[in-house]
């Protein structure tokens, strides 16, 4: 009994809840009942007691409890072992008598459950049919419920039609029919006439009608025979699945209704069920809409018997004899009644226009008007299937239809608004076509089993069709088509029916209920964001609900349609969803809120134009419903609404704004082809930060669009590389930023820019490429940190080489030295760089982009300047050191130790030596544009050592970078002579801190480099140590040695590269230098290389030319020693060691 008591408590706790009852609660009750299955009789009695004693609003929840318990028991234990179903059926009539005491609006839910039971075989038809009839009887008081009952009940009981209840119903219906407005009866009959047989019946009816009073009482036997034959056909056609009657618009509605019941059958959704039906109706205003829809269903079911009955109206129905001949008398009475409304039917057929007015009240009347349309005959076929149930349904349907129709003025209006259906029938001779069309209109229709448009919307539509026809017969098809299209668009946008003289404020706010208290905003957002953007989410955890404001009405509508159908869960808890009143609607207007449609219909005379804008909060204004006098005021809301609805973005999209953006992008697109265009684009971007890459991003985006075109054009670009360079550059990060600044002047003559770029590019790129490759090779061999060093060196070297080459130099230097050094090098190279700023940006990119070729650009960038440039920023700290070393390294290789080149000296690029010479490498060195001046500055000893050895150029570099003296070690004689290692260290420290910064702007790096060198030096020292057995570590501090070793390695690596290059041109020199180098390194390394070093430093300025030659020799010497060494790496290391040892020795 504990289980029974628990169930009792659980069930009666419903009283404490406000309907609708949640699914979770229903599940708890069901579980408690199943637990008490051993005392199932007690459980059944408790439920019946609850239904008997509860308040009217809890009647339907009590029915849901019965349904849930029975279905769960059947599912869990099987239909054979289910004990609850049979027990409930014993006293079910009394129970349903209490159930029908529920509010009239809930009776449709009871019928819904009965239909589900019938459909799923929960109870036998013999049990269900009387209950449906009971609903019909109560429906006399409450026609809506009756309609639903008839529609849905009748299809399942079709066979039962002949049963006594139908017969009784028929007589009842007969009186009802006379009572019904003729228009209502016509609505029902009209649907019947839609079938082909119905049309035949129509003809017969016309014969009846021809005499103002049909000869119904004295129907000719022939006529009766015809009617019966048609009825028989209808019966036979019913062979189509009875569900097909659903195909018939009314039956379909029922089917849709059933399906809705099945799909959405949720105890929580009690109110929603009604809402759903309305939703399915789309325009159906209220449950009456479903009821109205239902009446069509009855007619559909009636078709077999009812269709004839309708055709000859009621009399045929009885005569049809489904119930039996006995029925005929009532049928005749019906027929007499029919006589009263037949003239109207005739009138409608003859003059639809006149009868329009009556028809609208009966949403179904339009169907009657449709009769003339042939397309409906196919529809009639679907109707046929329902024939067996037709009689009862028909009788009930008359009553039900009658009231539903009267109750459905809104539906009628909506339907009227749906002229589309008219055309649908016109365009589609096939029932199916029209059906599919309507189905497409409303998703629910689609879902209906039969596939025919759901009866509600359909029959509504069919009504609208006939009505439209009558009403709009004068209208041109094109106009109707436009109207239909507009209506369809509105439906797709989720906009409700338009009411005359009424403003529609469509809510975009959804209410989601029954949420678990742990549910987060993210959970809700993830549920709804798939439908569209969410404006805001307001969670109310205590109430377990949330208000979600969607940006677009259409998205909210789709979310509601989908989530209200299936069993969607958040945090494993089923949710409910419904329209919520948007915040903008104040209390004064809440009375106009329609929760079913999610719209507030505010009469124009109640609207204050100044409030229109506020209505849009959490909703949108339906621009089609606004008073033309307000248009100016609500435009903002309208625009927002349009955007929200996704409907009229045109309003919100100011044409001007669109053109503005479009023009900009458009020019960019053409720009690729017309090089001239890009400059304009670039300038706009340039205005902000022309030189900085930042521009590039802005320019980049437009150029991005262009660059792809540019690349497309890129194919052609080879011929016009300069032009392409702009677009290409714009696409390229560097070019866009830099090019814009540089190109503006040279844009017209991009060629002019490219030439500078080209020489520097070609030379620097080749040289740089060589240098980078050599550096990488040497570094990889000599330096444990070759990658970093190589990157730095490569960058530095490339920068130096560029500097050395004049025009090329500025870009490279700037590119390599994006930091302050860039400006300084530029200043040093001022003569060389035309536009240091722009050139730097442009040239560097150009170097990186060698050709204006798109392909090359990306490729070269990584290997060439661009990559160094890019790397440089990140590697700047490490590179600065390697750059000095590298710069000096290369200089030693090429011209001895002209370290200044690293700063911008051309000496550093001996590999470019030939170029350097023509470029004025000596000149640069001498004049001090880059190398000379810097070297003179840094190389205090340069003049003295000019005569001395190739190292002279290197010597200056050495003073600048003591370690670079060791690169001379690669040219060993100079390095050894460059004893200034001590001096170098001093110079480095002194000059690096001051001079280097001044000259190269890198000196800051130089100092860093020394520190880095220490880091790298350790690594290099290790490698060097292996190769530098000669060095005496004791002479100098390991740090210094490490620095020197690093520098030497860098120099050697660069030197080797330079040497290789120089060796090509100066093999003989190399031989000479090798001899010298071998002798000198030893002497300098361990004798007093400092002296020798000093003269080279002093000589640097004068020795530039000589240094270049000597560099070649020194390189040769270095190369040879390196060759002599077991491996290049070791060789490079050993010379470094030698120089390092020499440097150490002086100290």
UniProtKB/Swiss-Prot annotation:
| Record's keyword annotation contains Amino-acid biosynthesis | no
Gene field: SCAF4
State a single Gene Ontology molecular function: RNA polymerase II C-terminal domain phosphoserine binding
Question: What's an example GO BP annotation here?
Answer: negative regulation of termination of RNA polymerase II transcription, poly(A)-coupled
- Give residue ranges for domain RRM: 508-582
Q: Where is the composition biased (Basic residues)?
A: 434-475
CID domain location? 1-139
The protein's job, in short, is: Anti-terminator protein required to prevent early mRNA termination during transcription. Together with SCAF8, acts by suppressing the use of early, alternative poly(A) sites, thereby preventing the accumulation of non-functional truncated proteins. Mechanistically, associates with the phosphorylated C-terminal heptapeptide repeat domain (CTD) of the largest RNA polymerase II subunit (POLR2A), and subsequently binds nascent RNA upstream of early polyadenylation sites to prevent premature mRNA transcript cleavage and polyadenylation.
Q: Which stretches are annotated as coiled coil? A: none
Q: Where is the composition biased (Basic and acidic residues)?
A: 424-433, 477-492, 1009-1085
Q: Which organism is it from?
A: Homo sapiens
Quaternary structure and interacting proteins, as annotated: Interacts with POLR2A; via C-terminal heptapeptide repeat domain (CTD) phosphorylated at 'Ser-2' and 'Ser-5'.
Please provide an example of a Pfam family that matches this protein in its UniProt record.
CID
Which CDD domains has this protein been placed in? CID_SFRS15_SCAF4, RRM_SCAF4
> Which UniProt keyword terms apply here?
Acetylation, Disease variant, Epilepsy, Intellectual disability, Nucleus, Phosphoprotein, RNA-binding, Transcription, Transcription regulation
List the biased-composition ranges (Pro residues).
879-913, 966-977
Q: Where in the cell is it found?
A: Nucleus
| PROSITE patterns for the chain | CID, RRM
Q: Residues where N6-acetyllysine occurs?
A: 49
> What is the protein's given name?
SR-related and CTD-associated factor 4
């Amino acid at each position: 009994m504990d289980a029974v008591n628990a169930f009792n408590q659980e069930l009666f706790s419903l009283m404490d809840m406000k309907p609708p009852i949640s699914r979770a609660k229903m599940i708890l009750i069901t579980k408690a009942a199943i637990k008490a299955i051993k005392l199932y009789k007690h459980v059944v009695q408790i439920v019946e007691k609850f239904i008997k004693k509860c308040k009217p609003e809890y009647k339907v929840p009590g029915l849901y409890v019965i349904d849930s318990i029975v279905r769960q028991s059947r599912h869990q234990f099987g239909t054979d072992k289910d004990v609850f179903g049979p027990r409930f059926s014993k006293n079910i009539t009394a129970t349903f008598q209490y159930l029908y005491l529920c509010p009239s609006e809930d009776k449709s839910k009871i019928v819904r459950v009965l239909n589900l039971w019938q459909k799923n075989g929960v109870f036998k038809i013999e049990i269900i049919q009387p209950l449906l009839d009971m609903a019909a009887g109560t429906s006399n008081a409450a026609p809506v419920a009756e309609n639903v009952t008839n529609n849905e009940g009748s299809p399942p009981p079709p066979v039962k039609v002949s049963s006594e209840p139908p017969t009784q119903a028929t007589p009842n219906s007969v009186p009802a029919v006379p009572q019904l407005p003729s228009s209502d009866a016509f609505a029902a009959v009209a649907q019947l006439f839609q079938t082909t047989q119905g049309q035949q019946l129509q003809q017969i009816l016309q014969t009846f009608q021809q005499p103002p009073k049909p000869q119904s009482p004295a129907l000719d036997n022939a006529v009766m025979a015809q009617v019966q034959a048609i009825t028989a056909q209808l019966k036979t056609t019913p062979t189509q699945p009875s569900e097909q009657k659903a195909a018939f618009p009314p039956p379909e509605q029922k089917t849709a209704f059933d399906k809705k019941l099945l799909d959405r059958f949720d105890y929580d959704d009690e109110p929603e069920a009604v809402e759903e039906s309305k939703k399915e109706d789309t325009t159906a205003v209220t449950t009456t809409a479903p009821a109205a829809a239902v009446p069509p269903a009855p007619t559909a079911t009636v078709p077999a018997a009812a269709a004839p009955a309708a055709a000859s109206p009621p009399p045929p129905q009885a005569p049809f004899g489904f119930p039996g001949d006995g029925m005929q008398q009532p049928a005749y009475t019906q027929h007499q009644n029919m006589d009263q409304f037949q003239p109207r039917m005739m009138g409608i057929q003859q003059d639809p226009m006149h009868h329009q007015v009556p028809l609208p009240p009966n949403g179904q009347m339009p169907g009657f008007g449709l009769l003339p349309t042939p397309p409906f005959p196919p529809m009639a076929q679907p109707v046929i299937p329902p024939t067996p149930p037709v009689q009862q349904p028909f009788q009930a349907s008359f009553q039900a239809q009658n009231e539903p129709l009267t109750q459905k003025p809104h539906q009628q209006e909506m339907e009227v608004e749906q002229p589309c259906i008219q055309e649908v029938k016109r365009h589609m001779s096939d029932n199916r076509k029209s059906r599919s069309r309507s189905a497409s209109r409303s998703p629910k229709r689609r879902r209906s089993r039969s596939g025919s448009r759901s009866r509600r919307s359909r029959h509504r539509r069919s009504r609208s069709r006939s009505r439209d026809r009558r009403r709009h017969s004068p209208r041109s098809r094109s106009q109707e088509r436009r109207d239909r299209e507009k209506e369809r668009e509105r439906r797709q946008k989720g906009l409700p029916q338009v009411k005359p003289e009424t403003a529609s404020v469509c809510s975009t706010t959804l209410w989601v209920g029954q949420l678990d208290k742990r549910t987060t905003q993210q959970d809700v957002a993830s549920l709804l964001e798939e439908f569209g953007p969410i404006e805001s989410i307001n969670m109310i955890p205590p109430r377990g609900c949330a208000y979600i404001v969607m940006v677009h009405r259409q998205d909210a509508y789709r979310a509601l349609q989908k989530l209200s159908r299936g069993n969607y869960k958040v945090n494993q808890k089923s949710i409910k969803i419904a329209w919520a009143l948007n915040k903008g609607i104040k209390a004064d207007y809440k009375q106009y809120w329609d929760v079913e449609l999610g719209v507030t219909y505010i009469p124009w005379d109640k609207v204050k134009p100044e409030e229109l804008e506020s209505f849009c909060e959490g909703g949108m204004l339906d621009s089609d419903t606004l008073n033309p006098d307000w248009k100016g005021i609500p435009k903002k809301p309208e625009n927002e609404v349009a955007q929200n609805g996704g409907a009229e973005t045109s309003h919100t999209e100011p044409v001007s704004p669109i053109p503005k953006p479009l023009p900009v992008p458009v020019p960019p697109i053409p720009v690729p082809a017309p090089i001239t265009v890009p400059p304009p684009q670039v300038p706009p971007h340039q205005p902000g930060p022309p030189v900085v890459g930042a521009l590039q991003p802005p320019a980049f985006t437009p150029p991005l669009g262009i660059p792809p075109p540019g690349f497309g054009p890129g194919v052609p670009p080879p011929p016009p590389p300069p032009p392409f360079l702009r677009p290409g550059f714009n696409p390229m990060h560097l070019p866009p930023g830099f090019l814009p600044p540089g190109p503006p002047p040279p844009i017209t003559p991009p060629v002019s820019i490219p030439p500078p770029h080209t020489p520097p590019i070609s030379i620097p790129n080749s040289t740089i490429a060589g240098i980078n490759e050599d550096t990488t090779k040497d570094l990889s061999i000599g330096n444990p940190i070759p990658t970093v060093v190589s990157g730095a060196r490569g960058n530095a070297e490339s920068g130096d080489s560029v500097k050395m080459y004049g025009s090329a130099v500025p870009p490279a230097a700037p590119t390599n030295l994006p930091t302050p050094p860039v400006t300084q090098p530029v200043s040093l190279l001022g003569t060389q760089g035309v536009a240091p700023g722009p050139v730097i940006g442009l040239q560097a990119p150009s170097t990186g982009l060698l050709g204006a070729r798109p392909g090359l650009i990306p490729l070269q960038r990584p290997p060439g300047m661009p990559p160094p440039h890019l790397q440089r920023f990140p590697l700047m700290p490490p590179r600065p050191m390697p750059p000095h070393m590298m710069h000096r390294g290369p200089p030693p290789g090429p011209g001895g130790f002209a370290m200044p080149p690293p700063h911008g000296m051309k000496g550093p690029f001996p590999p470019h030596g030939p170029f350097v010479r023509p470029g004025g490498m000596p000149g640069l060195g001498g004049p001090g544009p880059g190398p000379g001046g810097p070297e003179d500055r840094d190389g205090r000893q340069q003049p003295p050592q000019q005569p001395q050895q190739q190292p002279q150029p290197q010597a200056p570099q050495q003073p600048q970078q003591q370690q670079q003296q060791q690169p001379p070690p690669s040219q060993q004689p100079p390095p050894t002579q460059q004893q200034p290692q001590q001096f170098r260290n001093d110079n480095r420290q002194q000059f690096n801190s001051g001079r280097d910064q001044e000259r190269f702007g890198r000196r800051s790096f130089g100092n860093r480099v020394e520190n880095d060198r220490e880091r790298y030096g350790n690594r290099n020292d290790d490698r060097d140590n292996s190769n530098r057995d000669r060095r005496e570590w004791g002479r100098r501090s390991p740090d210094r040695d490490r620095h020197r070793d690093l520098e030497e390695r860098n120099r050697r690596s660069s030197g080797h590269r330079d040497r290789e290059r120089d060796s090509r041109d100066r093999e003989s020199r190399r031989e000479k230098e090798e001899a010298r180098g071998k002798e000198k390194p030893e002497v300098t390394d361990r004798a007093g290389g400092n002296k020798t070093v000093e003269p080279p430093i002093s000589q640097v300025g004068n020795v530039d030319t000589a240094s270049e030659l000597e560099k070649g020799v020194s390189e040769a010497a270095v190369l040879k020693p390196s060759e002599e060494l077991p491996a290049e790496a070791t060789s490079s290391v050993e010379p470094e060691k030698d120089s390092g040892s020499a440097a150490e020795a002086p100290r």
